[in-house]
Amino acid sequence: MNQRLFIQKKSEFDVISQKTTIELQNLVPHAVCKVFVIYDLFGIDENQLAKVQNTIFVDPVTDILYTHYEDAIVENFPYSKNFFATEFLPGQYNQRDDSAEQCLLLMNVEGVTVKSGMLYVFNGELTNEELLKLKEYLINPIESREKDLSIMEIPSYPTATEVPVIEGFVEADESKLKKIYADFGLSLEMDDLKFIQEYFQSIKRNPTETELKVLDTYWSDHCRHTTFETEITDVDFQSKFNTTLQKTFEYYQKIRQELGTTKPIRLMDLATVMGKYLSRTGVVKNIDVSEEINACSIVVPIDIDGEEEEWLLQFKNETHNHPTEVEPYGGASTCVGGAIRDPLSGRSYVFQAMRISGAANPLEKIDNTLPGKLPQRKISKEAANGYSSYGNQIGLATTFVKEIYDEGYKAKRMEVGFVAGAVKKEYVRREEPVAGDKIILLGGATGRDGVGGASGSSKTHDGLDLDDLSAEVQKGNAIVERKIQRLFRNPEVLKLIKKCNDFGAGGVSVAIGEIARGIYIDLDKVPLKYAGLNGTELAISESQERMAVAVEAKDVDTFIALAKEENLDATCVADVTDDETMTLVWRGKKIVEIDRKFLDTNGVRKQAKVIVTDEEYPNPFEQKEFNKEQFIQMMQELNHASQKGMVEMFDNNV
């Protein structure tokens, strides 16, 4: 049978209703709200329900159980018709569902599916317009939707269709290419699409949909830093500091000459040239250099019980501005989760984090929210909840938390996570995979949530509805990443790994595609969260908490067995080949076959001219007169307000 439960906290314990009411009264001052958790249990019999009802779902001391929402409404607001229910969109990870199903298995109740939601019941003095306001505030269409309480069914997923070939692509004129560009919603530029057309003309075939999407992802700004790799053809200084700037630029060019650098001037070169110079000249001797694309790494001496050992200290920062802007909780949680993945893929144990964020005024009236955006208050509060929840669950000491307030962040929020990790150097084996080696996918399963995350964060967003971005942000699963952290504490495991890459932006096509020059990936072996994903979605979904691990063929079974000891799924999904081609196979057909040399071009290099001018910013060194009025004005600024409440959400002493 199927059963629906409505769980409400007793008034003495109903903190969630109190908090929700206070929050919503910023929008509708006379609103009063009661919150219920909904559990839909599919395939459970009466005996099983009796066994688990008061163990997993209801605490008789603190909770009240209803089986019909009408009863819940009558008990709280008799005659009120102001209520609605919400649920996550199909395909979004729901930790409450996952935890409930695991608890059922622990009690030997198998075959039961759990789908949860929330019921919000309001006092009867609300107008339809006010109820609609509350509904729009509580439901973010990128992650959730209104739940129909008259229906109780498991969401169905469409059957995966074959990957189509883009007919007529190689013959397309510019107008046809522009239509293809618009139809596929590409983040690439038109000159990149023409470059792709030239490649497929040279091999005399049309690309598949997957090949075009993979290139759009692989060459995205998020994955390949195309903005920082843009060639700077001319620099013009128009500043009051011209002399100083010109001397600095000439010094930079001199350093390039000493290093023998012939590549074009780029922002990436400006950022890295001094590190290369100091390393080359022997000033800096502890930089750990490798072919892996993971975190920054330095070699440090560590005193272990009086013995000095060489360890790798690794650190990484990650921005999740776009994801947090559109889905604050998931965007901020996967900010720290994504930052952790980089040093973790470098085999480090991540032990420390910092968070710096930027927002406009969170006290702004919700009615003043810009069209197509979430209220600043909602973004700030839910982002703090998301980041702290993920870090606290994984067991990470977040030792610095700061939010900066400026109206400029209304255009785009800033969400920055920083982490540090360490590993004993002798445990890290770094070798280039060779033909015959195997690639193991370690960790979470793949879902539709995360398709387009890399290309989405690389686009210019003009007038998009939040609904259009629903697949680009995921909910993280900190518990799975914590298991990977534990697994990688085992020296036996680390010594099996020749090379490792985390599943960040781009999913399988990037994480496994980068690990060796020749790779053959069987997408049918990729574990799924649910049925219905097609080959394109399998190739580019960046579902969280996964690693691509290269091992020798003889070590596959050993690695998988060690992963199972940590309750981690590990599946061999790819082979390293010697043909310098990235090949992806789905349902026995090649849906991607791209030459490595073409893939490595990263598209058409962009060019730009730079004009350096002065901006009208307040002079930070200006000495203002100290008086009562200026002191009061300064203390009234948001950036001088106490952030203690936010800081205390983060565990800083794990």
Segments (PLM) and residue ranges:
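Glycine/proline-enriched, intrinsically flexible loops and inter-domain linkers
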Residues: 91-93, 111, 117-130, 135-654
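Short, solvent-exposed interaction modules
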Residues: 59-111, 256
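Short glycine-/aliphatic-rich beta-strand segments at the starts of folded cytosolic domains
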Residues: 1-11, 35-40, 78-90, 119-120, ...
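Short amphipathic alpha-helix segments
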Residues: 11-28, 53, 92-108, 513-526
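Flexible hinge/switch segments at interdomain interfaces of large molecular machines
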Residues: 30-34, 67-81, 111-116, 167-171, ...
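Acidic (E/D-rich), amphipathic helical modules within compact regulatory domains
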Residues: 19-74
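Short amphipathic alpha-helices in soluble, non-transmembrane regions
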Residues: 19-24, 49-59, 97-104, 130-139, ...
